[in-house]
């Protein structure tokens, strides 16, 4: 039933937040200045405290243990693995963000992002990506730029329907559907 389910764990701190509805929050979480938290599970515990900061709007998602979300990020229909971060206006929509990943200043839609992903420039993918199926990549994206290796190590695997935007740069070797 809508508007009925919610839980706040032990030692959780919530300050200056506008809307919190149908949200389960684990212990030791820290939430300050969030605009909207709706229909969420925020996993948090003493050894892996999750934090949500100023201006965040999060709807229909699961946030893993030890995650940090700050500075006006927006996420809708999403899952974040443990110890992941969204920062500086990033948008995560209809996507899964793997463990130990960081996304800043950019938009990720309809994506399966594997663990240890770092995306910290506008419209850039700086690590290996698996993009399968009917997929689209933002204009100006850069795939693989010596951040995880200097050798050709299969930076991108793209399946049927892969559609890169204008000025996309694919560095190192790549595998595409035939």
What label would you give each PLM region?
Residues 1-134, 138-140, 144-161, 166-169, ...:
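Domain-scale signature associated with acetyltransferase and cell-envelope carbohydrate enzymes
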């Amino acid at each position: 039933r809508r508007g009925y389910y919610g839980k706040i764990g032990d030692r959780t701190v919530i300050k200056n937040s506008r809307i919190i509805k149908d949200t389960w929050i684990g212990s030791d979480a820290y939430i300050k200045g969030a605009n909207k938290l709706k229909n969420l599970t925020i996993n948090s515990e003493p050894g892996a405290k999750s934090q949500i900061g100023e201006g965040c709007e999060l709807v229909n998602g699961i946030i893993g243990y030890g995650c940090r979300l700050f500075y006006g990020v927006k996420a809708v229909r999403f899952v974040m693995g443990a110890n992941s971060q969204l920062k500086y206006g990033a948008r995560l929509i209809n996507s899964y963000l793997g463990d130990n990943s960081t996304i800043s200043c950019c938009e990720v839609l309809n994506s399966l992002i594997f663990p240890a992903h770092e995306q910290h420039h506008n419209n850039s993918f700086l690590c290996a990506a698996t993009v399968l199926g009917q997929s689209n990549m933002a204009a100006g994206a850069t795939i693989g730029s010596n951040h995880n290796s200097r050798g050709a190590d299969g930076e991108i695997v793209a399946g049927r329907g892969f559609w890169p935007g204008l000025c996309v740069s694919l560095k190192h070797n790549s595998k595409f559907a035939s």
